[in-house]
Amino acid sequence: MAVWLLRANMKQLDWIAVDWGTSSLRIWGLGADNQQVFYLASDEGMASMHDAQTFETTLLKHVAAYLPADKSIPVLCCGMVGAKQGWHDVGYQVLPCNPLTHQSPLRVPDTDPRLKVWILPGLSQQSPADVMRGEETQIAGLLSKLSAAKPFDGMICLPGTHSKWAQVETGEVIQFATFLTGELFALLGQQSVLRFSVSDSEWCEDTFVSAVKEAYANPAQLSHLVFSVRAADVLAQPQGKHGKARLSGLLIGLELAGAKGLASTKQVQLVGNDDLTKLYQTAMTALGLAVVVQSGDDLVLLGLQSAYQQILE
C-alpha cells in the first residue's frame, strides 16, 4: 500500500470528493468555495477492498483527521466504488441522458455519523450493449466546462485500458462505444507469441504512425497485421526492432477505424493526462482529425463539483 498526501492547508472542510477506481483512490477535501483543504492519492483501489465496510474504513483512515466532531460532511464518490463489487451498487443511467441529473447522486449506507456518502451511477446503453463507470464524471466535467454559452455537441474520446468514445448532442450522451484496446495490447504483448518481439523493443514514432494508418485503412486485416509484428522480428527486418510501437499503432488504428462511424465531426475532445493520451493525439493528428486535449484529472474534479451542486439543490 502506498499513500501520498500531496497538499494540505487549514481551510474549513465543507465536503469531500472521491475518485475510487479499480486500482487507485484519490480524495479531495474542499471548502465551501471549492478551494482545496487537502488532497490524497493512494493505490488502495476497489480491487484491494474486501467488503463494503472496508471502503468506509479505508476512507475514514485517510480523512478522519479533517472531520469536525459536530456535523456530518458530505462525501461524493465516482468510479468503481459504485459497482457490484464496490461499496454499494448504484447501477447505471440509461442513454440518452445527461451524465448528471438531479436524481443521479445516490445516497448509500454508511455507519459513521461524521459522513454522508453519495455515489454517482455509471451510464448504460442497451443496443449495442455497453456500460461505463467513472468516465461519465469526466464527461460531466467536460460538459460543464464547454457548455457555458450553449449545450455541447461533439465527440469525446477517453483512452484507457477500455477506451470510451461518446457522442454528445445538446448536452446529452446519445451513444457510446467501448474499445478493449489497452487490454488487447497487454494480452498480446505479454501472453502471446508477440511477447518475444514487444517486451524489449525500441520505440519508434514513425513506425507507430505507419501502423496506425495501415490498420485504419485495412481493419479487416488486423489479425494478419498483428502477426507481422512477430514475423518482422524473426526475419530481422528494420521494423522488427520496433514491435511495441507497431503493435500499439495497429491496435489504436483499429480503434480509430471503429470509432469513425460514430463521429459526426472531425474534431475530437481527447480526455486524459498520460503518455497514452499523447499516443492517441499523435494517431488522430496523423489521420487528419482535429484534437483538443483536456485534462482528465481536472475534469474528474469538475464533474464531482457539478454533481455536488445537484445535491445542494
Stretches with model-predicted labels:
Residues 15-19, 74-76, 154-158, 269:
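Short glycine-aspartate micro-motif
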Residues 15-54, 294:
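Short glycine-rich, Thr/Ser-proximal phosphate-binding strand/loop in the N-terminal lobe
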Residues 24, 265-283:
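Glycine-rich phosphate-binding loops at beta-strand->alpha-helix junctions
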Residues 36-73, 82-85, 89, 194-197:
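N-terminal phosphate-binding loop and adjacent alpha-helix
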Residues 47, 123-218:
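Glycine-rich phosphate-binding loop plus the immediately following alpha-helix
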Residues 68-129, 170:
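Short beta-strand-loop/turn "lid" adjacent to the catalytic site in phosphate-handling enzymes
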Residues 215-258:
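Adenine-nucleotide phosphate-binding core of ATP-dependent small-molecule kinases
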Residues 250, 292-313:
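Glycine-rich phosphate-binding/hydrolytic loop that grips phosphoryl groups
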